[in-house]
Swiss-Prot record:
Organism: Tragelaphus oryx (Eland)
Originating gene: RNASE1
UniProt keyword annotation of Lyase present: yes
Keywords: Disulfide bond, Endonuclease, Hydrolase, Lyase, Nuclease, Secreted
Subunit structure, interactors included: Monomer. Interacts with and forms tight 1:1 complexes with RNH1. Dimerization of two such complexes may occur. Interaction with RNH1 inhibits this protein.
Positions annotated to bind substrate: 7, 10, 41-45, 66, 85
Catalytic residue positions: 12, 119
Name assigned to this protein: Ribonuclease pancreatic
């Protein structure tokens, strides 16, 4: 079974590019990373930084998560991210996404030993 940490990497890490390559980025990535298998995942964020830099956020600024849990951390520095948001015309299995690039602080939830990101909470 896929671990929570591995799922985070699959759904949110794209260290191989510094930003979204094209307006088609989300359509390609959401499909290739298995987020359109059973349904269209409505919203997802990819982070274009090294895994080490994203894992380091787990020891950065302690903040509350959206759901009120306290295991979230905000990055001290901004990171290159791409937001993928389902378009109005998107219909499973033909999932369609709008690609938006940004430089923002990320907020992740961390757990385990080693203490690593398991959930992408928000970007600010």
């Amino acid at each position: 079974k896929e671990t929570a940490a591995a799922k985070f990497e699959r759904q949110h890490m794209d260290s191989s590019t510094s930003s979204a390559s094209s307006s088609n980025y989300c359509n390609q990535m959401m499909k290739s990373r298995d987020m359109t298998k059973d349904r269209c995942k409505p919203v997802n964020t990819f982070v274009h930084z090294s895994l080490a830099b994203v894992z380091a956020v787990c020891s950065z600024k302690b903040v509350a998560c959206k759901b009120g849990z306290t295991b979230c951390y905000z990055s001290y520095s901004t990171m290159s991210i791409t937001b993928c948001r389902z378009t109005g015309s998107s219909k499973y299995p033909b999932c369609a996404y709008k690609t938006t690039z940004a430089z923002k602080h990320i907020i992740v939830a961390c757990z385990g030993b080693p203490y690593v990101p398991v959930h992408f909470b928000a970007s600010v």
